Amino acid sequence: MRSAWRIVRAARANSAFTGEGARVYGGRWNSRGTAVVYVSEHESLAALELFVHMMPMPPTGRYLSFRLEWEDKLTEYFQKKNLPPHWNTEPPTFETMQIGDEWVRRGKSVALAVPGVLSTSEMNFLLNPRHSDFKKIKISEPIEYRFDPRLVNR
């Protein structure tokens, strides 16, 4: 079994698995117009990903954490050796966005494992909410997530 985490603002919990945010704004591994859900291998990486995307403002308000589980056979693994040059730069490159877009177009798996930029020894996953196997992903009831005050009171 594969597991992952997603942390979202409580106000967005109902739409946390639609892929709409990524579809509207794009991301490192998808361009605007392609709906995907970003999740992280560990809850700490999910928190760090959220934190870095909110900088320079610290996260405020209520957050919820979801644990996801799915069979590993539903995951395609993108090989690090195939990463384009500058895959981890900011802003994200067209080449990395095309990786996710092409994966969605092919439709071979519901999950794509990609290396984390913030921690290259860990993985993030793209989930395709429109894939027929999306219903095979078990999503936990949300639990409250609190950012440590040492991170947000700086």
Residue ranges and their predicted role:
Residues 26:
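Short glycine/proline-enriched, acidic/aromatic patches that form the donor-sugar handling elements
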Residues 29-53, 125-130:
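Extended catalytic/binding region for NAD+/ADP-ribose chemistry, centered on the ART fold
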Residues 22-23:
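Protein-protein interaction/assembly regions in multi-subunit complexes
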